[in-house]
Amino acid sequence: MALSCSKVLSFYLSPVVGGGDVPKKLTFSSFLGLSKGVGGSRSSRVCAASNAPAPLAGVIFEPFQELKKDYLAVPIAHNVXLARQNYADDSESAINEQINVEYNVSYVYHALFAYFDRDNIALKGLAKFFKESSEEEREHAEQLIKYQNIRGGRVVLHPITSPPSEFEHSEKGDALYAMELALSLEKLTNEKLLHVHSVAERNNDPQXADFIESEFLYEQVKSIKKIAEYVAQLRLVGKGHGVWHFDQKLLHDEDHV
């Protein structure tokens, strides 16, 4: 009996008795040569018909031919990434550098949290703000780590600089000084992110460019705008009683980061 499957390839289901001849198979018959014994003496096998027509003209994609390209070969060495594709070495390095940037900024914010949480400073709103800011930057670093692994890169954690522990400023006061420092850090982080984006574009890596754009760049300019407003407000209230009111606003504001 005959089994027709398409105009490109045709197959028939032939009974095989004992060791009879089996029709000639296609070159990728290893994917199609299925057999099942029945009663131990008679079986059925899917085979290519010897009169199968030639492939249709105009075929634009032949996967098994395409897979012969060397750069699509799956690595055998156990220490080589299997997922890596179109991921340049300098893109990998730029992501590792950005991980370090995020951890460093997180560390500075954590130092600010510790400072404002002191018993003789006791600006709980600022302590809360910088603690949450530190956690956010650390989450960014972890997000970059996950992306590095997705692309088949290797995470390299660089040393983190120790931040200062004192943030008193005789002219500006500690609150304004700390918030201006935070604004500068956010602008610096944005500059570093733009560098990572430019590296991705230079290497024709739209996936990395899209990752930086969609996950970081817009949120970064929002953070810059928010902290710039805080700097402006602290400049208005001065170093006295107004700082306490500003701090209370931060303490009870659930959407300040």
From Swiss-Prot:
GO terms for cellular component: chloroplast; cytoplasm. Fe cation 1 binds at E102, E137, H140. It is found in: Plastid, Chloroplast. It holds the Pfam family Ferritin. The keyword Cell division does not apply. InterPro entries: Ferritin, Ferritin-like, Ferritin-like_diiron, Ferritin-like_SF, Ferritin_DPS_dom. Its main location: plastid. Fe cation 2 binds at E137, E186, Q220. Keywords: Chloroplast, Iron, Iron storage, Metal-binding, Oxidoreductase, Plastid, Transit peptide. Residues 1-51 form a transit peptide. Residues 85-238 form the Ferritin-like diiron domain. CDD domains: Euk_Ferritin (cd01056). It comes from the Eukaryota. It is an enzyme of class 1 (oxidoreductase). GO terms for molecular function: ferric iron binding; ferrous iron binding; ferroxidase activity. Belongs to the ferritin family. Oligomer of 24 subunits. There are two types of subunits: L (light) chain and H (heavy) chain. The major chain can be light or heavy, depending on the species and tissue type. The functional molecule forms a roughly spherical shell with a diameter of 12 nm and contains a central cavity into which the insoluble mineral iron core is deposited. This is Ferritin-2, chloroplastic. It comes from Glycine max (Soybean).
